[in-house]
Amino acid sequence: MAEVPELASEMMAYYSGNEDDLFFDVDGPKQMKCSFQDLDLCPLGGGIQLQISHEHYNEGFRQAVSVVVAMEKLRKMLVPCPQIFQDNDLSTLIPFIFEEEPVFLDTRNNDACVHDAPVRSLHCTLRDAQLKSLVMSGPYELKALHLQGQDLEQQVVFSMSFVQGEESNDKIPVALGLKAKNLYLSCVLKDDKPTLQLESVDPKNYPKKKMEKRFVFNKIEINNKLEFESAQFPNWYISTSQAENMPVFLGGTRGGQDITDFTMQFVSS
């Protein structure tokens, strides 16, 4: 912040010298014969009067603002002359001194802002349109099969996180992690074909608001059914086979032999 200089000697020459009422006359060294206590407005035709209170003499910023405003900003208008310069008076003068300008923050490359944002998550299970549940088959594979009774405890509980992505009215970007495991569903290219896999991650860094694109799925709701489209590979969906006990995979067709419709059941934390 720039320093406000002390009152110049030329200005001090216009100082009245009265201990009780100190005035400045903008037009010259003529002491004004009026009191701030008797006037609500100081007309500029009679000169601009400034009262400096000894009680607030050490508050240099207030004093400087009074002088600057009177000499530079209030020359063309009528201004109230309060008995004592108060905090609320300063707040009303600030807009006349400083010009307000909008500040635009470019966050396109500011990943730190996104990383620090809280991630909203929920726990759920998924079943396909044939009511097959998803279960673990080996350390890095999911299969779909029918479960009943106590076997339902085998189904995978997902931690669905709402992440950054191309959100629209019908698409919500999410990441699908496995509850209590450091595994996330991700989409990668293998043998020139989009492929679904379970990928191990560092729990210190995941989940996060800005997930890598291979982890992001667009959750689409149609007729109370859900589809999960890969953000990395548009028009490719989490799919199951018509057959029992087959791996969950990434399919490129909808409404055909492969099942892309799921129902979601919420699970309490």
From Swiss-Prot:
The UniProt keywords, alphabetically, are: Cytokine, Cytoplasm, Inflammatory response, Lysosome, Mitogen, Pyrogen, Secreted
Which GO BP terms apply?
A: cellular response to lipopolysaccharide; cytokine-mediated signaling pathway; fever generation; immune response; inflammatory response; positive regulation of canonical NF-kappaB signal transduction; positive regulation of cell division; positive regulation of immature T cell proliferation in thymus
Site-annotated residues for Important for interaction with integrin = 171, 179, 181, 190, 204
Database matches in CDD domains: beta-trefoil_IL1B
Q: Which GO terms describe its cellular component?
A: cytosol; extracellular space; lysosome
Q: Which residues form a coiled coil?
A: none
* Keyword Secreted found: yes
As one GO molecular function, the record gives:
interleukin-1 receptor binding
Family to which this protein belongs: Belongs to the IL-1 family.
Any extra remark in the record? IL1B production occurs in 2 steps, each being controlled by different stimuli. First, inflammatory signals, such as LPS, stimulate the synthesis and promote the accumulation of cytosolic stores of pro-IL1B (priming). Then additional signals are required for inflammasome assembly, leading to CASP1 activation, pro-IL1B processing and eventually secretion of the active cytokine. IL1B processing and secretion are temporarily associated.
Q: How does it assemble?
A: Monomer. In its precursor form, weakly interacts with full-length MEFV; the mature cytokine does not interact at all. Interacts with integrins ITGAV:ITGBV and ITGA5:ITGB1; integrin-binding is required for IL1B signaling. Interacts with cargo receptor TMED10; the interaction is direct and is required for the secretion of IL1B mature form. Interacts with HSP90AB1; the interaction facilitates cargo translocation into the ERGIC. Interacts with HSP90B1; the interaction facilitates cargo translocation into the ERGIC.
What is the name listed in the Swiss-Prot or TrEMBL entry for this protein? Interleukin-1 beta
Gene from which the chain derives: IL1B
